[in-house]
Amino acid sequence: MGLLPYKQRCFNINEAHLDDEVMTSCFRILYTHFNKLGINWGPAFSSLIGIVRNDGYLSWANNLCIYILKEDEERFKDELWAIIADGFEVIRYERRGLYYLRKDKQYIKIFILRKIASNVRHTGGSDFIFEQYLQDTTKWEFRGMIMFLQS
């Protein structure tokens, strides 16, 4: 497919505001792409808490956090062409496994989880997740989207 056009942008995610309707629309588009790929993915960190506890997003959240397993990263990168065609921008990429996407002034962080031990995954930053939580999931409905969330 060639090189993905990428222009690093200066942005301040701390000044971002998460709009409930617009973010749900963005989430729905990514949901369709990720499910088409058949990869292990899902909401993570504060986004997971908001979906389960509030059936929405946390009031102080300024982005949506999603995880993807390292072994699915190449398929995700191949799908980025279609995601960009749906109006998303890749506004930041870090080789440690962090992608920032933006659409309609909404920010999405995608964490690539690397296996660092038989039972532990790492985001490349300060966060660790037990493998068991990613494999033992619970079926969850969020605004018409059926997901398998970390148990």
Report each predicted region and the residues it spans.
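Catalytic metal-binding acidic patch
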Residues: 55-75, 144
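Active-site nucleotide-donor binding segment shared across nucleotidyl transfer reactions
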Residues: 31-64
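Short, solvent-exposed loop/turn segments at secondary-structure junctions
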Residues: 47-50, 73-74, 97, 115-117, ...
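Helical scaffold of the NTase/Pol beta-like nucleotidyltransferase catalytic core
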Residues: 1-44
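Metal-dependent nucleotidyltransferase catalytic core
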Residues: 19-26, 67-101
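Alpha-helical scaffolding within the catalytic cores
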Residues: 51-53, 93-98, 133
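Catalytic cores of NTP-dependent nucleotidyl/adenyl transfer enzymes across multiple folds
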Residues: 2-6, 24, 104-151
